[in-house]
Amino acid sequence: RIQDVNVQKSAENEPYSYFVDELTAQAIQELQDRLGYTKDKATDLLYSGGLTIYSTQDPSLQTIVDEEVNNPDNYDTAKHSVTWRYTLKHDDGSIVNYSEKDLIRWMKEVKGINFNGLFSSEESAKSYVDQYKAELVSETDKEMGEQFFTTLEPQVSFVLMDPHTGQVKAISGGRGEKRYSLSLNRATGTLRQPGSTFKLITSFAPAIDLYGATLATPFYDTAYTLGNKTFKNWYSSGFLGYQTIRDGIIYSLNIIAVRCLMEQLNPHEGRLYAENLGITSLVDGDENPALALGGITHGVTNLELTQAFATIANDGQFNKAKFFTKILDQEGNVLIDTTEDQPRQAMKDTTAFLLTDAMKQSMLPNRAYAASLNVNSTSTRAHFDGMSLAGKSGTTTKDVDIWFVGYSPY
């Protein structure tokens, strides 16, 4: 049994929460890593060995997260993407499988609809599926199976972590109904491009930490080409001339981040530095200038990015993200106690202080000194009064991914 309020299911068939899904996965992995169990033995022990597991979750905070993630007022729009699987058996014995890709192709090519893959409602999606099926099925065909469901868009994930302990207090793997246990958890199981959040952990942080740069170290913001790649800033046009690392953080300046990576250190060291902060998804092909902008092969998980920034919040001390504090066997003996884990100094405390100071300013209204350009600080939408805050935003091309990662001392 997992000893915590979040596991008490109101109905036998109710799926586990995202938190419990991740707690379960981490417990099985830790039983292997710390006690040398096989995966099968760890799994059997978890589900039928009478274990007691103490969660790190704060139920009151989890309730707030769930309410805010699912509050439609927090989103500019509400669309639905479709997952559809349909199998037909023809009278000649052949079997044909269809999916939402076939549906979308039919809508564009046959119906002539300029369609981006998102429906206005679940009912609208089902209506088009039914129309498509009517054209597919003959009297002699036999339906072998069908799966249909919609997913609210845009989707979201959220991680709330205590940076001093690594304990995860609340998590959300997505908005909308969670249909089954161990379903897709967008906070821990989905790799997304991190955008400008990576400027800190692959470029600015290692430059300060390893090479003695400061927030006042300048780089020249101008047209910048390396090989066949020309780098641009996120705003429309123009350049700011000499700008410091502090400016690069506050205004999220692409060229400053790339020049810092290439002129103060190198992409290999930038990758190693991110990995030292717990990023595990980088590959050799990521060792290029685009690393400074989060242009990487596979992306990162929300959990690992939160873990990396939690290191900055914790004066440079790294804690692995934890979903439980203790595991006890059926006799009450402690098998694992994560509260005894010691943090690892992953960056100098002075580096963490400087990065925090710059990220505080990125959340306040600031404007770059340039008469012909309107370049403002990039994280102001996450700011609220009454509390000291630090953080960094990140976006990718056409706003496919939008990030904010930040912290307070409370």
What are these regions (language model features)?
Residues 9-13, 212-270, 330-356, 360-361:
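Conserved catalytic neighborhood of penicillin-recognizing serine enzymes
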Residues 151-157, 179-201, 216-219, 290:
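Short active-site loop at a secondary-structure junction
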Residues 65, 165-166, 192-219, 248, ...:
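Active-site SXXK
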Residues 1-100, 275, 280-281, 290-294:
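Non-catalytic, structured segments within soluble enzyme domains
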Residues 13-22, 55-63, 178-179, 192-197, ...:
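Soluble non-cytosolic domains of exported or imported proteins
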Residues 46-51, 182-189, 231, 240-242, ...:
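Flexible glycine/proline-enriched surface loops and loop-helix/loop-strand junctions
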Residues 230-232, 264-307:
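Mid-domain, small-residue-enriched loop/turn segments at the edges of structured enzyme/sensor domains
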Residues 55-75, 82-90, 95-150, 154-162, ...:
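A penicillin-recognizing enzyme superfamily signal
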